[in-house]
Amino acid sequence: MRKLAIIGASGHGRVVADIARRIGYCEIVFFDDDESIHECGGYPVIGKSSEVGTIDADVIIGIGNAGVRKQIQESLPDEKLVTLIHPDAVVAEDVVIGKGTVVMAGAVINPGVRIGKGC
């Protein structure tokens, strides 16, 4: 069973969860530092972002603010981070996409493109 932990339980996180579900993640959980949030898009919030390493799961950051996303990603081990690509995105065969990046529905990424980590 594929399990995904998403850091950030808000609108961007809901979009990331939808992509994850569409590409085969069966279990999705959230981590967020706002203790008043208990669910996001029907998925449980099970802890603070600093606790994400306590479970055996792939990890992605579902926070829209690029600066905050970068700061959090730098504190995480690369081997846990995954890249998510929506099935309705068009990605050329030779594209290189860094870990922690999410490619949204309708995106077109042309040949020769390189996308960094956490974009």
Residue ranges and their predicted role:
Residues R2-I61:
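A solvent-exposed beta-alpha-beta segment
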Residues I7, C26-F30, E79-L81, V102, ...:
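Broad hydrophobic/π-residue packing in well-ordered secondary structure
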Residues G24-C26, I55, K80, V96, ...:
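Short loop/turn motifs at secondary-structure junctions
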Residues S36-A92:
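Phosphate-bearing ligand-interacting subdomains
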Residues T83-C119:
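Structural signal for interior beta-strand "rungs" in well-ordered beta-sheet cores
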